[in-house]
Every structure is written in structure tokens, then in C-alpha cells.
Amino acid sequence: MSILITGGAGYIGSHTVLTLLEQGRNVVVLDNLINSSAESLARVSKICGRKPNFYHGDILDRSCLKLIFSSHKIDSVIHFAGLKSVGESVEKPIEYYQNNVVGSITLLEEMCLANVKKLIFSSSATVYGEPEFVPLTEKARIGGTTNPYGTSKVMVEQILKDFSLAHPDYSITALRYFNPVGAHPSGLIGEDPNGKPNNLLPFITQVAIGKLSKLLVYGNDYDTPDGSGIRDYIHVMDLAEGHLSTLINLTSGFRIYNLGTGVGYSVLHMIKEFERITGKNIPFDIVSRRPGDIAECWASPELAHLELGWYAKRTLVDMLQDAWKWQKMNPNGYNC
């Protein structure tokens, strides 16, 4: 049996593909390569000596999905595919709903036709909107999201919940990620944003290597100790291992888990720690807040620990060192 991973050439997807291949699983990847590179999968094969089956296609393309399900004995699906930039989603809401919501419905319909009943959905901590309290548990209120990206994740979660009630023999889990950072310790795969990075750590590493002149810190007037936004940063390899733990522990019905460390760090703290660990100076300017950003957000990961036996093992130092190693080895990402 094989596992279909949509968006498997992307940042989190490629690290998850690697983790599953290393565990001896058979993997099929579907990716349209709009925000990713097939080179990531070539690097995965270099690391572990095994190759996934790769399809260059889109989750909105029913014929492509039918081909995959008819050509492989798919047992379960891990669904990463989708657009993911908070800022861009504010500018292009229709594209986000089309890709993230309609695409997920299309995938689910084709899974039903192929009688594939196990699904892990890549959700996000953005579903919590403006948090009423931190740390966030899975029982916290969702909705009230501040951007279409987050809203699209809320919508898909609700669709999956409703579907699960109508089809109790399906096993569906939504994983709410916090802020993935870092890279595989080999330095061969990592985060390779198109254009200027939207996420903090690749922005920092590109400044450190001289690709960008300075970092932009979006807001220093939040109600936090140093005025900058606080987030729960989690090593991408911990996140990948979280998918393996979820796959092993899938049960019928609909489940939700936070995947985070349970510790929040501010933007300014991240800059200082990176400078301390690497010895690189990171010049930055304070600019106005981005639309849709919130002051602070970090997880309570206790439920995943209790029910999946999973917890984040890697430290902030690991995250920063691995991200920097990836950047130094790949100054232009996968476009070497």
C-alpha cells in the first residue's frame, strides 16, 4: 500500500516524504510545483536512497487524481497542497478559496470514489484567529480569522468534520501547525521561498548571507514584552515526525491536534538568538504591522503527546543552526 502526499515537493511536504520513506513506506507525491521544486524530491532520494512516485499535477484536476488512485494502491492521503501566504491571501482571496477549499473538496470526492478512507489534513494555528488566551488548546474557539488563508483552513476543517459525521468509517485528522522553521540536518532540503520570504527565519538567513540587505520587522507596538509578535516555532523535522505518529495512530472519526512546542518566542528574540549562535549581524528596520497579523500565538501540544505519543524534541538552537546550514549550502535555494 502507498501513501499519497499532495504538495509533497513543498517545505513541510518534502521533509514528511523523507520521514516516511526512511520508515520503509511507499510514497506517491502530487505537486503542481507553483511554490515548490522537484529538486527537493531528488534531494530526498539522495538522503535516503529511495524515490517517491511523482506526479506533476493539481488537486483541482480530477483526471490526474483518478490516474493516481487507479495506478496505485493508495491507503491514506496526507494533504499539504494549497496556497499559504497570509499577506497574499488578503490580496487574492478568490485564488485562496479556489485552491484551498475547492481543491480539498475535489480531493475528498475522488478519495471517496477510490474508497480511500484515511486522511491527514494540513491545517494551521491561524484557524484560532485572535486568540482569547494562550497557550491554545484544541478546544479554543476557532473562526474570527483575520485573513482568507486562515478562513480557508477553518472552512476545510468544518467540511471534514461534517463529512466525518456522515461517513463515520473514515479516519480523518486535522493537524494545526504553528510556525515551521529549520531544515533537515544534512542541509540538503529546507525552506525555499519564491521571491522575498513571507516567514521570519528565511528572511533572517537571507539577510545573513547577503541576499537581502536588511530584515523588516512588522510592528513593535504589540502588547508583548518587547513589542514584537510572539510565535511558537517548531522544527520542520519534528513536524514531519508528527505526521508519522498521526498516521500510525489514525482512528475512525474526526480528530484535531496542535503541533507546536508550547513555547513562544518574539521576533526580536529570534533575531538576537540567531546573531548569538551564528555570529552574523542582522540589520533590521521596524515597519508597520501587516494586515491580518496577531500579537501572540503558541500551542498547548499536550493532546498530541497524550494520544499520539508525539512531542517536539528539537530546540530553538537546533532550528536556527539547521536553517543557517541550509541557507549557507544553498544560497539560491534549489536553484543552484
From Swiss-Prot:
<feature type="binding site">
    <location>
        <position position="178"/>
    </location>
    <ligand>
        <name>NAD(+)</name>
    </ligand>
</feature>
<protein>
    <recommendedName>
        <fullName>UDP-glucose 4-epimerase</fullName>
        <ecNumber>5.1.3.2</ecNumber>
    </recommendedName>
</protein>
<keyword id="KW-0520">NAD</keyword>
<feature type="binding site">
    <location>
        <begin position="58"/>
        <end position="59"/>
    </location>
    <ligand>
        <name>NAD(+)</name>
    </ligand>
</feature>
<feature type="binding site">
    <location>
        <position position="99"/>
    </location>
    <ligand>
        <name>NAD(+)</name>
    </ligand>
</feature>
<keyword id="KW-0299">Galactose metabolism</keyword>
<comment type="pathway">
    <text>Carbohydrate metabolism; galactose metabolism.</text>
</comment>
<feature type="binding site">
    <location>
        <position position="149"/>
    </location>
    <ligand>
        <name>NAD(+)</name>
    </ligand>
</feature>
<comment type="similarity">
    <text>Belongs to the NAD(P)-dependent epimerase/dehydratase family.</text>
</comment>
<comment type="function">
    <text>Involved in the metabolism of galactose. Catalyzes the conversion of UDP-galactose (UDP-Gal) to UDP-glucose (UDP-Glc) through a mechanism involving the transient reduction of NAD.</text>
</comment>
<dbReference type="GO" id="GO:0006012">
    <property type="term" value="P:galactose metabolic process"/>
</dbReference>
<dbReference type="InterPro" id="IPR001509">
    <property type="entry name" value="Epimerase_deHydtase"/>
</dbReference>
<feature type="binding site">
    <location>
        <begin position="31"/>
        <end position="36"/>
    </location>
    <ligand>
        <name>NAD(+)</name>
    </ligand>
</feature>
<keyword id="KW-0119">Carbohydrate metabolism</keyword>
<dbReference type="InterPro" id="IPR005886">
    <property type="entry name" value="UDP_G4E"/>
</dbReference>
<feature type="binding site">
    <location>
        <position position="149"/>
    </location>
    <ligand>
        <name>substrate</name>
    </ligand>
</feature>
<feature type="binding site">
    <location>
        <position position="153"/>
    </location>
    <ligand>
        <name>NAD(+)</name>
    </ligand>
</feature>
<keyword id="KW-0413">Isomerase</keyword>
<comment type="subunit">
    <text>Homodimer.</text>
</comment>
<feature type="binding site">
    <location>
        <position position="231"/>
    </location>
    <ligand>
        <name>substrate</name>
    </ligand>
</feature>
<feature type="binding site">
    <location>
        <begin position="216"/>
        <end position="218"/>
    </location>
    <ligand>
        <name>substrate</name>
    </ligand>
</feature>
<feature type="binding site">
    <location>
        <begin position="11"/>
        <end position="12"/>
    </location>
    <ligand>
        <name>NAD(+)</name>
    </ligand>
</feature>
<feature type="binding site">
    <location>
        <begin position="80"/>
        <end position="84"/>
    </location>
    <ligand>
        <name>NAD(+)</name>
    </ligand>
</feature>
<feature type="binding site">
    <location>
        <position position="124"/>
    </location>
    <ligand>
        <name>NAD(+)</name>
    </ligand>
</feature>
<dbReference type="InterPro" id="IPR036291">
    <property type="entry name" value="NAD(P)-bd_dom_sf"/>
</dbReference>
<dbReference type="Pfam" id="PF01370">
    <property type="entry name" value="Epimerase"/>
</dbReference>
<feature type="active site" description="Proton acceptor">
    <location>
        <position position="149"/>
    </location>
</feature>
<dbReference type="GO" id="GO:0005829">
    <property type="term" value="C:cytosol"/>
</dbReference>
<feature type="binding site">
    <location>
        <begin position="199"/>
        <end position="200"/>
    </location>
    <ligand>
        <name>substrate</name>
    </ligand>
</feature>
<feature type="binding site">
    <location>
        <position position="179"/>
    </location>
    <ligand>
        <name>substrate</name>
    </ligand>
</feature>
<feature type="binding site">
    <location>
        <position position="124"/>
    </location>
    <ligand>
        <name>substrate</name>
    </ligand>
</feature>
<feature type="binding site">
    <location>
        <begin position="290"/>
        <end position="293"/>
    </location>
    <ligand>
        <name>substrate</name>
    </ligand>
</feature>
<dbReference type="GO" id="GO:0003978">
    <property type="term" value="F:UDP-glucose 4-epimerase activity"/>
</dbReference>
